[in-house]
Amino acid sequence: MTLHSPQPRWSREQIRTARLAPLVPLLQQRALQLSEQAAGNFLLPAYPGLIVKDSYWRWPERNLAGNAIDFFVQILGLSFHDAMRQITGP
């Protein structure tokens, strides 16, 4: 029998803070290459066409956009709980 540790319960404030987390430093911590463009936009060569600015990202070619949590879930494939852990730290 395998015991799983319970998933943490995240408060509304923790989720709000994670949504607004600046993406560029988080992506740099994960060693993702970023290319700075005009007006504070960054491109990720590993994801052609994806644009990051502040705590938001958009990928026009795929009709996707979102906040920091969405990036970790939709683009990097993490679960919500793993995304929250990555964004909020240990």
Predicted segments, located by residue:
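N-terminal structured subdomain of primase-like DNA metabolism proteins
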Residues: 1-90
